[in-house]
């Protein structure tokens, strides 16, 4: 029987005893004879009653034969007169109250119960399992022994360099002497920085699973709560516990909640978070050398962290965790798919090529959506068709096949998307067009998907201008074929203007203004984002900027117009094909652009897309066989592997796999690269126009 059970039984026994005493005290003494009131009156009239004793509620008395009796007093106003008439002795006296000790119990027992309950909760809070009164105690969880994390380094894919640095940190704690012998100082802190979903917290969990030392984990929001001074107290308690368990690792997730830059702002010059940060700074820089406590932290907003928190001596290392490349995405897909049954035709390398810019969280969600899709179709294995549907769902949302649109609106969307596709297909420096659809998905009325041939981090001026021309191709197509323009191009115009403005004001790509950056951003640290831009240029420069934006947009618009006018027949063919089939994949677009007719519609668009993926996989396998054949005939295997891999990538790109999400690519590459996937929104999509920023 544990301590809690013993205390509960003791308090229960005390309560039962007290209740029993009260019942005993309030129990009425039993009378020898209990009469009804009418019987009592009959005996009075018969002269059988000798005397009565009238109390507050009862009438007690004695009959002439010596028998005692009791009856209830109903409050009869004529009772006294009746008793006098029949010469019954009457004794009327004040009702005695309860004894003094009973009254004492009435006041003492509630007070005693309150004290007992108070001490009970105090005992529970001091036992470590609860935090009822320990507001200043740290909420960090200790992972060691059976409570150690099950995540290991082999469960983290696509972050080889990041894992190497963290393995070194773990080795510092496991074998510190070999580093100390060389005069090396154990790092005091490691800061994991990167976009959301790239695996920073997962890396922390992997360190907890691999480290042979205690591991404390806590969130940045767990420090500051309702009471003043709680945050600093919890920081002190956390590091006191860490020192008792040294060597150990302390992991603070989302440290920007407590480590935001200090200074006067919307929150005032000094607040609870600032006091907590000051205590954290003192604790991190107050260690003895080689004490064996390493602080790990993760954040996706390193730009708002206090500079004193990031300096060497506190966070000696900053590890940037970016979105994975092609190889990393394939490894991540393998990790998430290893416990899921896949069909034989599933090629994760094809899926990885279709998802540039996806983070680890995106890929995990993709595989999970594919599993849900397969279960919905009552399948026991996941195939390429399910993965294709999952990619479309993650990128563009759920198909709105039930949405009813008029033929005129359908024609507007068809010509609009055909304009995007043709301009993007014909201009030499754009990404290949992989899918065009006029089926509404999510908030989009139709979309054109363009997949880059390789992971990109930089864009040239020519590529940006052609990107703008592709965005404007939808509006130009509406104007050429329908002699009318619609609100469907609103998001295209906004994005095109944004690209041109960035080219002029941030990238220095204007011929007239030259290689300069205009308009410095203001950062409000207590808001955690940039809410204003300094106008550090004159009105003449502002006029020149507006004029340059107009000229570049007009030039791109004219380029798109000339491209479509020269291929007006192809615009008509693709638009009609979209009206008929609703979705065109890369192979079908290529056939139409080459003047060929499409085969009859025999299967649904999902099956056509799946067939395209299977053909691509077969092409990849065929090239892999050719690679093995060529390896047998050449002496230099390494050179042959490199050449075959290049050919494999080139063939896959020529096959033009289906789409990828430009919006995801923008988020994971650089904030301004809103260039890989074009999704055109209707007038309903104004609320989603900032998705690509």
From Swiss-Prot:
Active-site residues from the entry: 417
Biased composition regions of type Low complexity, renumbered to the chain: 627-642
Cofactor note: Binds 1 zinc ion per subunit.
Extracellular side: 29-100
InterPro entries, sorted: AAA+_ATPase, AAA_lid_3, ATPase_AAA_core, ATPase_AAA_CS, FtsH, P-loop_NTPase, Pept_M41_FtsH_extracell, Peptidase_M41
Binding-site residues for Zn(2+), renumbered to this chain: 416, 420, 492
Domain of life: Bacteria
CC annotations in GO: plasma membrane
Main location: membrane
GO biological process, one term: protein catabolic process
Its membrane topology: Multi-pass membrane protein
Pfam family, one: FtsH_ext
E.C. number: 3.4.24.-
Record's compositionally biased regions (Acidic residues): 644-666
Family listed: In the central section; belongs to the AAA ATPase family.
SUBUNIT field: Homohexamer.
UniProt protein name: ATP-dependent zinc metalloprotease FtsH
UniProt organism field: Natranaerobius thermophilus (strain ATCC BAA-1301 / DSM 18059 / JW/NM-WN-LF)
Primary gene name: ftsH
């Amino acid at each position: 029987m544990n301590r809690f059970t013993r205390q509960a039984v003791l308090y229960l026994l005390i309560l039962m005893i007290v209740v029993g005493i009260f019942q005993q005290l309030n129990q009425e003494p039993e009378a020898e004879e209990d009469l009804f009131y009418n019987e009592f009156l009959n005996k009075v009239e018969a002269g059988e009653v000798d005397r009565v004793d009238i109390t507050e509620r009862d009438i007690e008395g004695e009959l002439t034969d010596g028998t005692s009796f009791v009856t209830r007093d109903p409050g009869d106003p004529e009772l006294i007169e009746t008793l006098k008439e029949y010469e019954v002795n009457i004794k009327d006296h004040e009702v005695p109250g309860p004894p003094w000790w009973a009254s004492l119990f009435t006041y003492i027992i509630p007070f005693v119960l309150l004290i007992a309950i108070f001490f009970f909760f105090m005992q529970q809070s001091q036992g470590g399992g609860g935090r009822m009164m320990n507001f200043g105690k740290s909420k960090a969880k200790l992972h060691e022994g059976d409570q150690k994390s099950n995540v290991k380094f082999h469960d983290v894919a696509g972050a080889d360099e990041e894992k190497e640095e963290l393995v070194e940190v773990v080795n510092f704690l496991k074998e510190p002497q070999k580093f100390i012998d060389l005069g090396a100082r154990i790092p005091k802190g490691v800061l994991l920085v990167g976009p959301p979903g790239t695996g920073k917290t997962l890396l922390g969990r992997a360190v907890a699973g691999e480290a042979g030392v205690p591991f404390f984990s806590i969130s940045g929001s767990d420090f500051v709560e309702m009471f003043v001074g709680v945050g600093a107290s919890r920081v002190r308690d956390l590091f006191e516990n860490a020192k008792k368990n040294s060597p150990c690792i302390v992991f603070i997730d989302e440290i920007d909640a407590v480590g935001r830059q200090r200074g006067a702002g919307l929150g005032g010059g000094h607040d609870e978070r600032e006091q907590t940060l000051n205590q954290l700074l003192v604790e991190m820089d107050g260690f003895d050398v080689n004490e064996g406590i390493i602080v790990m932290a993760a954040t996706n907003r390193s730009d708002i962290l206090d500079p004193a928190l990031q300096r060497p001596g506190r966070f000696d290392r900053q590890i940037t965790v970016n979105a994975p490349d092609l190889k990393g995405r394939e490894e991540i897909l393998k990790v998430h798919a290893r416990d899921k049954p896949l069909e034989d035709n599933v090629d994760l390398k094809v899926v990885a090529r279709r998802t540039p810019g996806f983070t680890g969280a995106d890929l995990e969600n993709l595989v999970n959506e594919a599993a849900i899709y397969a279960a919905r179709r009552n399948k026991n294995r996941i195939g390429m068709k399910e993965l294709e549907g999952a990619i479309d769902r993650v990128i563009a949302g759920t198909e709105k096949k039930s949405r009813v649109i008029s033929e005129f609106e359908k024609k507007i969307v068809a010509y609009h998307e055909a304009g995007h596709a043709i301009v993007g297909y014909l201009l030499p420096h754009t990404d290949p067009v992989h899918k065009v659809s006029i089926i509404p998905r999510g908030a989009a009325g139709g979309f054109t998907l363009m997949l880059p041939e390789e992971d990109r981090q930089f864009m040239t001026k020519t590529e940006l201008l052609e990107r703008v021309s592709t965005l404007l191709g939808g509006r130009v197509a509406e104007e050429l074929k329908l002699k009318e323009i619609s609100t469907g191009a609103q998001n295209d115009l906004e994005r095109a203007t944004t690209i041109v403005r960035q080219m002029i004001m941030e990238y220095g790509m204007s011929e007239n203004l030259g290689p300069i950056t205009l308009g410095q951003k203001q950062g409000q640290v207590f808001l955690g984002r940039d809410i204003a831009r300094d106008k550090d240029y004159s009105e003449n420069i502002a006029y020149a900027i507006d004029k340059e934006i107009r000229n570049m947009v007009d030039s791109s618009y004219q380029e798109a117009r000339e491209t479509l006018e020269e291929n007006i027949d192809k615009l008509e063919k693709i638009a009609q094909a979209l009206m008929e089939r609703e979705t065109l994949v890369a192979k079908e677009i290529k056939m139409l652009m080459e003047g060929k007719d499409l085969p009859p519609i025999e299967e649904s668009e999902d099956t056509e897309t799946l067939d395209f993926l299977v053909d691509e996989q077969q092409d990849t396998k065929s090239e892999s066989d050719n690679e093995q054949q060529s390896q047998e005939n050449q002496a230099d295997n390494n050179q042959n592997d490199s050449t075959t891999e290049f050919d494999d990538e080139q063939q896959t790109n020529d096959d033009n796999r289906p789409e990828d999400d430009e919006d995801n690519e923008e988020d994971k590459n650089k904030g301004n690269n809103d260039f890989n996937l074009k999704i055109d929104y209707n007038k309903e999509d104004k609320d989603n126009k900032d998705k690509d920023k």
